[in-house]
C-alpha cells in the first residue's frame, strides 16, 4: 500500500509541487513501516520500494530547499538496504541508495560531514567514486586545493570502470554516467 501512497509524488515532482511530494513520501514511509512490521514482509519490497520512499523524499525535500528533511531522508535511504545485498545481481540500485547521503551533503554544503564520512568498502567502486567526488567538493569549498586535486585524480580513476559502467540504477540509469558527471562538476569547480 505504501507504494500506491508514494506514486503521486512522481506527478508532484514533475509539476513543481515539491512540498506535496514530500508529504506523499512521508505518508508512504509511515504506511510501509506499518505494513512491513505487521506482515514481517521480506524480499524485494522492503529492499527496494520502501527505501525508494526515503530516496524520493530526499529528492522532493531537496528541491523545496528543506535541508533537514532531505539529509535525514538521505541517511535513512542509505541505512535501509543490508550491506550483504549490495552486490547481488539485480540489487545494484542499493549501492546508489548508499551514496545518497554524499549527494545530499554536497547539495547543502555540509563539508565537515563529508570529510568525516567513512570511506566505503573498496568492493563498492561506485560508492567510493562518489565519496571522492564529495571530498573533492568539500576541499574546494574549504580552499584546500591541493587535497581537492588529489580527490579529483582519485575520482577520475573510476571513469570507464567496467564494474561501474555495468551497474544500472533502476535497471536503466548507468552509474558510470553519474561518475562522469561528478568528474565534470568537480573539474568545473
Across the structure, where does each feature detected by a protein language model lie?
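Solenoid-like repeat scaffolds
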Residues: 1, 43-44, 78-89, 117-126, ...
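Hydrophobic, small-residue-rich alpha-helical packing segments that form membrane-like cores
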Residues: 1-4, 8-14, 18-35
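Start-of-helix signal in alpha-solenoid helical-repeat scaffolds, especially tetratricopeptide repeats
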Residues: 2-5, 44-47, 51, 95, ...
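"A position-specific structural signal for the A-helix of alpha-solenoid helical repeats
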Residues: 7, 14, 56, 100, ...
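Alpha-helical repeat scaffolds
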Residues: 20-31, 65-80, 109-122, 145-160
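C-terminal substrate/ligand-recognition segments
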Residues: 140-143, 148-151, 175-189
Amino acid at each position: 500500500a505504501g507504494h500506491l501512497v508514494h506514486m503521486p509524488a512522481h506527478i508532484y515532482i514533475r509539476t513543481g509541487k515539491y512540498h506535496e511530494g514530500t508529504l506523499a513520501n512521508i505518508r508512504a514511509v509511515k504506511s510501509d513501516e506499518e505494513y512491513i512490521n505487521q506482515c514481517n514482509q521480506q524480499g524485494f519490497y522492503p529492499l527496494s520500494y520502501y527505501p525508494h520512499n526515503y530516496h524520493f523524499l530526499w529528492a522532493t525535500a531537496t528541491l523545496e530547499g528543506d535541508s533537514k528533511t532531505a539529509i535525514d531522508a538521505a541517511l535513512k535511504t542509505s541505512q535501509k538496504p543490508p550491506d550483504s545485498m549490495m552486490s547481488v545481481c539485480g540489487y545494484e540500485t542499493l549501492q546508489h541508495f548508499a551514496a545518497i547521503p554524499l549527494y545530499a551533503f554536497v547539495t547543502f554544503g555540509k563539508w565537515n560531514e563529508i570529510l568525516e564520512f567513512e570511506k566505503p568498502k573498496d568492493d563498492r567502486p561506485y560508492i567510493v567514486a562518489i565519496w571522492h567526488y564529495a571530498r573533492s567538493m568539500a576541499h574546494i569549498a574549504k580552499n584546500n586545493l591541493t587535497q581537492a586535486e588529489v580527490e579529483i585524480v582519485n575520482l577520475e580513476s573510476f571513469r570507464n570502470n567496467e564494474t561501474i559502467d555495468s551497474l544500472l540504477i533502476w535497471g536503466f540509469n548507468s552509474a558510470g554516467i553519474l561518475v562522469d558527471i561528478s568528474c565534470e562538476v568537480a573539474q568545473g569547480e
